[in-house]
C-alpha cells in the first residue's frame, strides 16, 4: 500500500505545485464570525441563496483550473440565484496542527446543527484529520440529506449509472451519497507476454482465489514477478463492516483468503513501478515485470504510454470472491441534513452527475478516475488526461514542455482499451468507499503512535502477528466502534 501512495504523489506532481494554504471564502457581513467557516447557508441578498461547499483547498486554486472547480463556477454563473461559498481547510501536509483545529471546528458546527451545506469529498486521505472519516457510519446516523426525494425534479436517471457503484451511497434503498468517480482493480501488462505465457484468463476470472492461483502458477513456471499494489479485503463483494446489520465480518473464508494472498504478494512480489518511466514501460513490454496489479487510477498511467508506443495491452479486471468486480469509490458528494436549502443542494449535486460534468471528469481527484455515468467513460478519460498532462493552464507550458509531456505520459487511450475498461465496469457488483486499514476509522493509536488498524495490518503483513491474532484482536474493537 505504501507504493500506492508513492505513485499517487507522482500523479499529483503532474497536476501542479498547488499551494495548500487556507482557502476559506469570506463570510457574509451579517453572519456571526466565531469560526472561519459559514455556520449554515446564509442569504446573500433577498433573492440569492448562499450554499457553503466543503472542497479541499487544492481544488480551489484559480490558476490551476481543476475540472470540478471550473464546473462549480459554471453552475454558479448559470444560476444567479445561487451563490457558492467554499469551505477549504488547510492541507494536513503543510500545517497538520491547523488542519486538525479546522476539522475539529467543522465537526463541532455540524454536531450543533450548522456546518457546510454540501460536501465534495475524495476517498484518498493524506492525513488522519478528515471530515466524516467513516462516511458510511455518518450515513447510518442520518447526517445527510435524502437525495432520492429530489431525483425526479432534477431529471436524474439511475439507469444511466453503474448501479453497483450508486448502491454504495444508499441506505434502505434511498440515495444519501452520490458517488462521482471510482476505480477498479486491474491486471495490466503487454498482451503478447501474458498470452504467450500460458496464462488462462478464463480460469482466472472465476473468483479472487482462482485469479491468484492461476497467476501464481504462471509466475512460478516462468520465473517471473508482478508489481502488486492492492488492498484485497476492500475488493471483496462482502464488506468488512456490515453497517446495516451491525456486524463485523473479519472472520469469514473470503477475508481470510484475501489476507493470506495479500501477505504472500506483499512480501514476495515487486512493490513499485514507475508508470511514467519510458524504460520501465519498455521493460514491461518485454515481460519484466510480468504485469501490474493496480487500481485503475494508477494503472491508467501505464495504459496511456503502452497505447502511444503501439504496444497492445493486456487488461483484465481482478474478480472478487463471487466472480464480479468490486469498485472503490474515489470521490463522492452529499448534502447536510441540516441544510436550509435542500432543493438547491440537490440541484447542485445532481448537476455533478450530469453528462456535462461527468464527461469533463469534474470530481475532486488528482488522478484519472472512472465516471459513474456509463456513457461518459471515453470523454471523461480524455478530459482527465488532458488536465493531468497539460495542467489545463497551457499558457504556463513551453513547446518543449508540451513535447516532453506528450512523450512521457502518452496520448489518449485507444478505443479498444476504453472498450476493455467499459467491459470490466459492466461486471461491477459492489463498491466500497474506503479501506478500513488506512486513515479511515478512529480506533485510536498503537504504542508507536500509529493508527491502530494500519499498525495491526503491517504487523501481520511484515511481522510476527498471525492471521488468527489479527482477526481476534480487531473484531471486538471494531464491534465496539460500530456500536458507539
Describe these PLM feature segments.
Residues 18-133, 455, 464-484:
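Conserved N-terminal structural module of periplasmic/extracytoplasmic solute-binding proteins
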Residues 121-184, 311-319:
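Hinge/lid segment of periplasmic solute-binding proteins
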Amino acid at each position: 500500500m505504501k507504493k500506492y501512495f508513492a505513485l499517487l504523489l507522482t500523479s499529483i506532481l503532474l497536476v501542479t505545485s498547488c499551494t495548500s494554504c487556507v482557502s476559506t471564502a469570506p463570510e457574509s457581513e451579517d453572519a456571526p464570525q466565531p469560526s472561519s467557516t459559514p455556520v449554515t447557508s446564509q442569504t446573500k441578498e433577498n433573492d440569492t441563496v448562499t450554499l457553503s461547499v466543503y472542497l479541499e483547498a487544492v481544488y480551489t486554486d484559480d490558476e490551476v483550473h481543476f475540472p470540478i472547480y471550473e464546473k462549480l463556477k459554471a453552475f454558479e454563473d448559470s444560476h444567479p440565484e445561487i451563490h457558492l461559498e467554499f469551505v477549504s481547510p488547510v492541507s494536513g501536509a503543510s500545517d497538520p496542527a491547523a488542519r486538525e483545529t479546522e476539522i475539529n471546528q467543522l465537526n463541532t458546527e455540524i454536531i450543533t446543527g450548522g456546518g457546510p451545506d454540501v460536501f465534495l469529498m475524495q476517498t484518498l486521505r493524506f492525513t488522519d484529520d478528515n471530515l466524516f472519516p467513516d462516511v458510511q457510519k455518518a450515513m447510518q446516523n442520518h447526517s445527510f440529506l435524502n437525495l432520492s426525494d429530489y431525483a425526479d425534479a432534477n431529471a436524474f436517471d439511475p439507469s444511466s449509472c453503474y448501479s453497483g457503484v450508486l448502491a454504495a451511497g444508499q441506505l434502505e434503498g434511498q440515495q444519501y451519497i452520490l458517488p462521482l468517480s471510482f476505480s477498479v482493480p486491474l491486471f495490466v501488462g503487454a498482451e503478447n507476454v501474458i498470452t504467450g505465457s500460458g496464462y488462462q484468463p478464463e480460469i482466472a476470472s472465476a473468483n479472487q482465489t482462482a485469479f491468484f492461483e492461476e497467476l501464481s502458477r504462471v509466475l512460478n513456471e516462468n520465473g517471473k514477478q508482478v508489481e502488486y499494489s492492492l488492498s484485497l479485503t476492500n475488493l471483496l463483494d462482502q464488506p468488512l463492516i456490515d453497517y446495516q446489520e451491525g456486524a463485523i465480518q473479519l472472520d469469514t473464508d473470503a477475508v481470510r483468503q484475501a489476507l493470506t494472498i495479500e501477505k504472500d504478494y506483499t512480501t514476495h512480489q515487486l512493490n513499485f513501478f514507475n508508470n511514467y518511466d519510458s524504460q520501465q514501460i519498455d521493460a514491461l513490454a518485454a515481460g519484466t515485470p510480468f504485469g501490474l496489479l493496480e487500481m485503475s487510477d494508477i494503472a491508467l498511467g501505464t495504459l496511456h504510454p503502452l497505447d502511444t508506443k503501439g504496444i497492445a495491452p493486456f487488461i483484465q479486471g481482478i474478480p472478487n470472491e463471487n466472480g464480479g468486480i468490486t469498485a472503490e469509490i474515489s470521490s463522492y458528494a452529499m448534502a447536510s441534513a441540516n441544510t436550509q436549502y435542500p432543493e438547491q443542494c440537490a440541484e447542485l449535486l445532481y448537476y455533478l452527475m450530469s453528462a456535462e460534468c461527468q464527461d469533463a471528469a469534474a470530481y475532486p481527484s488528482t488522478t484519472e478516475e472512472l465516471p459513474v455515468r456509463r456513457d461518459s467513460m471515453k470523454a471523461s478519460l480524455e478530459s482527465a488526461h488532458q488536465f493531468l498532462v497539460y495542467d489545463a493552464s497551457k499558457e504556463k507550458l513551453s513547446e518543449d514542455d508540451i513535447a516532453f509531456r506528450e512523450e512521457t505520459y502518452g496520448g489518449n487511450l485507444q478505443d479498444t482499451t476504453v472498450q476493455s475498461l467499459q467491459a470490466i465496469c459492466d461486471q461491477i457488483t459492489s463498491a466500497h468507499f474506503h479501506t478500513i486499514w488506512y486513515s479511515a476509522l478512529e480506533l485510536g493509536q498503537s504504542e508507536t503512535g500509529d493508527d491502530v488498524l494500519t499498525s495491526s495490518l503491517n504487523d501481520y503483513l511484515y511481522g510476527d502477528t498471525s492471521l488468527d491474532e489479527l482477526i481476534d484482536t480487531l473484531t471486538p474493537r471494531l464491534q465496539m466502534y460500530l456500536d458507539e
